[in-house]
From Swiss-Prot:
The keyword Phosphoprotein applies. Residues 153-192, 298-359 are annotated as: Disordered. It is found in: Cytoplasm; Nucleus. This is NF-kappa-B inhibitor beta. SMART domains: ANK. The lineage of its organism: Eukaryota, Metazoa, Chordata, Craniata, Vertebrata.
């Protein structure tokens, strides 16, 4: 495990790289270099100790600020690291601070990290972006924040993340540790716009987009958010070619199905084996599914459409296919104030299937 054992010792360049910040480049620890500690003044001699700290689980100080929901410390860290790669350092589970904030459903933290320049396309060990994770835990406000265009300029110490004196007045005497030596305003706006939109098409290691995840979880509110943001309503998942309509039918989520149809999803779409959403609906006990599809012009299935595809062998054919892999991250809830006031959310208590309510 990576980690810095002693906070009381001066960290040299080797310790800095060993701490997990080596990804910032060999010059990151050199005074005047392009990394996180560029142009350090004597007042910032503490910076390598704080920003170089990593636990045995790979969590940085920024991860810990999110896990413990310590907003003053989070604001302090962001004041010096906004716009740098430090925001996207990953722990041993591949999670960035933004992933953790989404899992915990902390919308204000997501907003601060996003505004500071945290990457929204970074994936954790299951291939999930922060938006995927927000969809899995039904964190609607977090998803809403991530689906907004990023602010024009990452916040830095001269913006909202300022240290304050005892009388609560901003202290602007320090310079941000993080600097962008060669900003390119012409390209930044285009990249920001592309960045948040690309989230909608990002696939996890199961081939699911955030919309697929929201449909599998039968979350109509999240589906509406993604639809309003421009998600592709007809994109098939790669294993069997199921579109969001197919997934809604397989989950017997009539409300989600109605929402997708009203939004313009194609009722004639076919899985790789040839089955239409109506063909799948006729294998389910809920008659509302077929009625909704017929009302929106779904064609009656031919005999060949009724044959079982490689992905389905019963009326609950999605039960085994719509599950995410891997264990969840109970440590991030055990150490947060959330666990003191209410039961841990389901994604942190046990492995989280993509279909929490199998038919």
């Amino acid at each position: 495990m990576a980690g810095v054992a002693c906070l009381g010792k001066t960290a040299d360049a080797d310790e800095w790289c060993d701490s997990g910040l080596g990804s910032l480049g060999p010059d990151a620890a050199a005074p005047g270099g392009p990394g996180l500690v560029a142009e350090l003044s004597p007042e910032l001699s503490w910076a390598p100790l704080v920003f170089g700290y990593v636990t045995e689980d790979g969590d940085t100080a920024l991860h810990l600020a999110v896990i413990h929901q310590h907003e003053p410390f989070l604001d302090f860290l962001l004041g010096f690291s906004a716009g740098t790669e430090y925001l996207d350092l990953q722990n041993d589970l591949g999670q960035t601070a933004l992933h953790l904030a989404a899992i915990l459903g902390e919308a204000s933290t997501v907003e601060k990290l996003y505004a500071a320049g945290a990457g929204v396309l970074v994936t954790e060990r299951g291939g999930h972006t922060a938006l995927h994770l927000a969809c899995r835990v039904r964190a609607h406000t977090c998803a809403y924040v991530l689906l907004q265009p990023r602010p024009s300029h990452p916040r830095d110490a001269s913006d909202t993340y300022l240290t304050q004196s005892q009388d609560h007045t901003p202290d602007t005497s320090h310079a941000p540790v993080a600097t962008d030596p060669q900003p390119n305003p012409g390209n930044e706006e285009e990249l920001r716009d592309e960045d948040w939109r690309l989230q909608l098409e990002a696939e996890n290691y199961d081939g699911h987009t955030p919309l697929h995840v929201a449909v599998i979880h039968k979350d109509a509110e999240m589906v509406q958010l993604l639809r309003d943001a421009g998600a592709d309503l007809n994109k098939p998942e790669p294993t069997c070619g199921r579109t969001p309509l197919h997934l809604a039918v397989e989950g017997q989520a009539a409300g989600v199905l109605a929402l997708l149809l009203k939004a313009g999803a194609d009722p004639t779409a076919r899985m790789y084996g040839g089955r239409t959403p109506l063909g799948s609906a006729l294998l389910r006990p809920n008659p509302v599914l077929a009625r909704l599809l017929r009302a929106h012009g779904a064609p009656e299935p031919e005999d060949k459409d009724d044959k079982l595809s490689p992905c389905s062998n019963s009326s609950s054919d999605s039960d085994s296919d719509n599950r995410d892999e891997g264990d969840e991250y109970d440590d991030i809830v055990v150490h947060s104030r959330r666990s003191q006031n209410q039961p841990p959310p389901s994604p942190a208590a046990k492995p989280l299937p993509d279909d929490p309510n199998p038919a």
